[in-house]
UniProtKB/Swiss-Prot annotation:
Gene name of the record: arnA
Record's function text: Bifunctional enzyme that catalyzes the oxidative decarboxylation of UDP-glucuronic acid (UDP-GlcUA) to UDP-4-keto-arabinose (UDP-Ara4O) and the addition of a formyl group to UDP-4-amino-4-deoxy-L-arabinose (UDP-L-Ara4N) to form UDP-L-4-formamido-arabinose (UDP-L-Ara4FN). The modified arabinose is attached to lipid A and is required for resistance to polymyxin and cationic antimicrobial peptides.
Protein name: Bifunctional polymyxin resistance protein ArnA
Provenance organism: Escherichia coli O81 (strain ED1a)
Matches recorded under SUPFAM superfamilies: FMT C-terminal domain-like (SSF50486), Formyltransferase (SSF53328), NAD(P)-binding Rossmann-fold domains (SSF51735)
Residues annotated as site: Transition state stabilizer: 102
Family: In the N-terminal section; belongs to the Fmt family. UDP-L-Ara4N formyltransferase subfamily.
Pathway field: Nucleotide-sugar biosynthesis; UDP-4-deoxy-4-formamido-beta-L-arabinose biosynthesis; UDP-4-deoxy-4-formamido-beta-L-arabinose from UDP-alpha-D-glucuronate: step 1/3; Nucleotide-sugar biosynthesis; UDP-4-deoxy-4-formamido-beta-L-arabinose biosynthesis; UDP-4-deoxy-4-formamido-beta-L-arabinose from UDP-alpha-D-glucuronate: step 3/3; Bacterial outer membrane biogenesis; lipopolysaccharide biosynthesis
GO cellular component terms attached to this protein's record: membrane
UniProt region (Formyltransferase ArnAFT), positions on chain: 1-304
Keywords, in A-Z order: Antibiotic resistance, Lipid A biosynthesis, Lipid biosynthesis, Lipid metabolism, Lipopolysaccharide biosynthesis, Multifunctional enzyme, NAD, Oxidoreductase, Transferase
HAMAP family: ArnA
Keyword Transferase: yes
Binding-site list for UDP-alpha-D-glucuronate: 393, 398, 432-433, 460, 492, 526-535, 613
Region (Dehydrogenase ArnADH): 314-660
Length: 660
């Protein structure tokens, strides 16, 4: 049976050997070039392929049409992936009539995603395994063909568990590959309600946070022990690595991070104490704990820290342009909740952020981004992270004021992007779900979905196209000039402080605010073209938590990424949104202050938005990038969001002259 193989690492080598032993004909192997910054303790797929006389390739993007065409010419009957690090597009998977199969290092549906070997140790699991599953468009989500369980011993570290998993994988493939070859397999669908997903780990993720329990820190040490980069901490600005450790149930009143003793080297934790058995100072040699203490100049009572002392003293400076807006004010609240951010903001108003004005780490200037260019350039240069959130983002304005939309949303933001390039500052740019336009995919995918808009004589697309072009400009600056960026695409975020009722009175607001105004004033709820258009509504708290994690950027996982932030489970039509809102309104304690419900009224989009409007029937996000990069899932049910949004707006209404 002819196959094309995607493989890397030891698992890739043993997968290839297993295929050859089972009588498969391997037409080509796709692998990766080795990362010079990664310790290569594993077998070389490229070398094995060369020794076996099999063509081998390592393209930067195997999903490029040219590579897709070359793979199609190979006419594979079946495709296998063994620890290949890039997602393979559905078009390639469909080339094999017998399907595509992937070997994953966990007991799916648990631990989907990257680095499951390390994550199970970090989380203190006592069992893991290997899974062979059918490949589908969503990573690690296809039906399970075979699994083999592997026990995790208390003394297992990453390398010993790796060897166990390789042994199990070899057994699994020996048992299963002949069955696939003869079409004699039983597939079991994964239970989505049991799925967990974890993102890529980097060396920077392995710092030891001493306020955590000793058992948690010991698991971290196990998870990244040599040949992985190791768990680390600091004495002042001196970094050191912990290669092995033991947990002590030591009852101590010492502050977490304090040295309890130096022989053995025992560190107080949030619960218990951690003995550093072996470690390494800087780029030095490995030594026992007591010698490490001497090398680092530690004595009883010394304090360790999770980051360099110089870094601990300086807060990250975040510049938010449009800080008074819906996202801006909620994000400010989230950042100021932590003690390591300094927020600088600019906006033309301050009503939503008045609650922060006396905060010592919040700095606000009232102004217009089209006028205060010198202030903006200075603060881009001064700050570490830039979020240009200023935009006209209400549909009626796209047809009412298309040139103003272009001038503000595109031209003013392009200038800010160029400042970030000039001063080499990280930009987190708000793209939009609107860029997908009339895409027909079931789930809108950041990396694969086409961006489809209407003709030029439909000005409603000027916002979508302005944002899309900025996305492309930012991407190009990242590729060609090293701009550090992340693009995030909100999908119908809603919650308190979304627009205001005055904006709704002139039609310049989002859907839920307009519907609330209709209820408050006793006017009919207008359903544009029947209100059958479906959207996925996302609670602002879920959205802001994802955005906060992008700013945190653990392990730089968000660099160069496009991330949808939405809740695919909260899909509803505008009509259904109106009905849910009405039900919440009718049982609200302030209901008696407002007029009777005036009913629903169907109106044509052209009469409401004006000439040149087109709508989109559905807009559902794929959130695999958010899961992978942020370890994020939306949690808040749509009804809860509706109730809280309605309550906020009803309590902003002056009730003094309303009937009781």
């Amino acid at each position: 049976m002819k196959t094309v193989v995607f493989a890397y690492h030891d698992m890739g080598c043993l997968g290839i050997e297993a295929l050859l032993s089972a009588g498969y004909e391997i037409s080509a192997i796709f692998t990766h070039t080795d990362n010079p910054g990664e310790k290569a303790f594993y077998g070389s797929v490229a070398r094995l392929a060369a020794e076996r006389g099999i063509p081998v390739y390592a393209p930067d993007n195997v999903n490029h049409p040219l590579w897709m065409e070359r793979i199609a010419q190979l006419s594979p009957e079946v495709i296998f992936s063994f620890y290949y690090r890039h997602l393979i597009c559905d078009e390639i998977l469909q080339l094999a009539p017998r399907g595509a199969f992937n070997l994953h290092g966990s007991l799916l549906p648990k631990y989907r995603g990257r680095a499951p070997l390390n994550w199970v140790l970090v989380n203190g699991e006592t069992e893991t395994g290997v899974t062979l599953h059918r490949m589908v468009k969503r990573a690690d989500a296809g039906a399970i063909v075979a699994q083999l369980r592997v026990a995790i011993a208390p003394d297992d570290i990453a390398i010993t568990l790796h060897h166990k998993l390789c042994h199990a994988a070899r057994q699994l493939l020996e048992q299963t590959l002949p069955a696939i070859k003869h079409g004699n397999i039983l597939e079991i669908a994964q239970r989505e309600n049991e799925a967990t997903c974890f993102g890529r780990r980097t060396p920077d993720d392995s710092f030891l946070e001493w306020h955590k329990p000793a058992s948690v820190l010991h698991n971290m040490v196990r998870a990244v022990a040599d040949p992985w980069p190791g768990a680390f901490s600091y004495v002042g600005n001196q970094k050191f690595t912990v290669w092995s450790s033991r947990v002590h149930p030591h009852a101590s009143k010492a502050q977490p991070g304090s040295v309890i003793s130096v022989a053995p080297l025992l560190i107080a934790c949030g619960d218990g104490a951690l003995e550093i058995v072996t470690g390494q100072a800087g780029d030095g040699i490995t030594m026992q704990g007591s010698q490490l203490a001497q090398t680092l100049g530690l004595v009883q009572g010394s304090r360790l820290n999770s980051q360099p002392a110089c870094a601990a003293r300086r807060r990250t400076r975040v510049l938010i342009l449009g800080v008074n807006g819906f996202i801006g004010n909620h994000l400010t609240e989230r950042l100021l909740r932590e003690d390591h951010y300094e927020v600088y903001g600019l906006d033309i108003g301050s009503d939503a952020i008045s609650r922060f004005m006396n905060h010592p780490h919040f700095h606000f200037v009232e102004g217009d981004i089209s006028i205060h260019s010198e202030w903006i350039e200075y603060h881009v240069k001064k700050c570490d992270v830039v979020l240009p959130l200023v935009a006209i983002a209400t549909p009626i304005e796209y047809t009412r004021n298309p040139l103003r939309v272009f001038e503000l949303d595109f031209e003013e933001n392009l200038r800010i992007i160029r400042y970030c390039v000039k001063y080499r500052k990280r930009i987190i740019f708000p793209s939009t779900s609107e860029v997908y336009g009339m895409c027909s995919d079931k789930y809108f995918d950041e990396d694969h979905s086409n961006l489809i808009v209407g003709p030029v004589n439909k000005p409603r697309w000027i916002y979508s196209v302005s944002k899309q072009l900025l996305d492309r400009v930012i991407w190009a600056y990242g590729e060609k000039e090293g701009l550090q960026f992340t693009l995030f695409r909100p999908f119908n975020w809603m919650g308190p402080r979304l627009d205001n009722l005055n904006a709704a009175r002139i039609g310049s607001s989002r859907a839920i605010t307009q519907l609330i105004l209709n209820l408050v004033e006793g006017s009919p709820i207008k359903l544009i073209d029947g209100g059958k258009q479906k959207r996925c509504f996302t609670d602002i708290r879920d959205g802001i938590e994802a955005l906060y994690r992008i700013i945190e950027n653990a392990g730089n996982r968000c660099d160069g990424e496009i991330i949808n932030i939405g809740n695919p489970e909260n899909e509803a039509s505008i009509e259904e949104l109106g009905e849910m809102l009405l039900a919440s309104f009718e049982k609200h304690p302030l209901r008696h202050y407002f007029p009777p419900f005036a009913g629903f009224r169907v109106v044509e989009s052209s009469s409401y938005y004006g000439k040149g409007y087109q709508d989109v029937e559905h807009r559902k996000p794929s959130i695999r990038n958010a899961r992978r990069c942020l370890n994020w899932e939306p949690k808040i049910d749509m009804q809860e969001t509706i109730d809280e949004t309605l309550d906020f707006f009803l309590r902003t209404v002056d009730l003094t002259d309303k009937p009781s």
